From Swiss-Prot:
GO terms for biological process: L-histidine biosynthetic process. Pfam families: HisG. Belongs to the ATP phosphoribosyltransferase family. Short subfamily. PANTHER family: ATP PHOSPHORIBOSYLTRANSFERASE (PTHR21403:SF8), ATP PHOSPHORIBOSYLTRANSFERASE ATP-PRTASE (PTHR21403). This is ATP phosphoribosyltransferase. It is found in: Cytoplasm. One of its GO terms (cellular component) is cytoplasm. The gene is hisG. NCBIfam families: hisG. It catalyses: 1-(5-phospho-beta-D-ribosyl)-ATP + diphosphate = 5-phospho-alpha-D-ribose 1-diphosphate + ATP. InterPro entries: ATP_PRibTrfase_cat, ATP_PRibTrfase_CS, ATP_PRibTrfase_HisG, ATP_PRibTrfase_HisG_short.
Amino acid sequence: MTQETQQLTLALSKGRIFEETLPLLEAAGIKVTEDPETSRKLILQTNDANVRVIIVRASDVPTYVQYGAADFGVAGKDVLLEHGGEGLYQPIDLNIANCRMSVAVKDGFDYESAVQQGARLRVVTKYVQTAREHFAAKGVHVDLIKLYGSMELGPLVGLADAIVDLVSTGSTLRANHLVEVERIMDISSRLVVNKAALKLKRERLQPILEAFEKASKRSS
């Protein structure tokens, strides 16, 4: 086998997931030698010549892993629900990047009354599939509008009655005069593995997966 076929590729997104994955990698004896926040490189080397990290958009991590461009990756439950999880093995909830997915509205909007009266609500979200399933299960009539950022703006400019988005501290909602009215689910990030890689590269992958699992349990 060539060096390239022996090499393991880990897909990560910049920001919180990357930062919170670093201690898990270090528990497996792997250190990333470059910082994606200061480097323009999208392929980062590690102290292990057989492990590299690729930096992709958070929503693209499952796709890279599904099609084998990455052997494994770390993605939020929110992203995996939208992706569908096809072709992925999800062995470990890493208990990192914890937050929640919630419904929020402009302060002063009576969400409960609108729902009880059967009003049709306009909702902006990046998580269309998850939002659709949530509102359908509750019997709430909604028109969903997909946005890719700045969800909080929707209710402020009359684009929507509500948003479905991730909430951590709630400070962004408060700064934009929005209030959380419904908690849909808790979100954390999970390890995802390409099913073919798990078979073909099990000997190299297994120790890393076990180290991740032990480290995530210690931090939970």
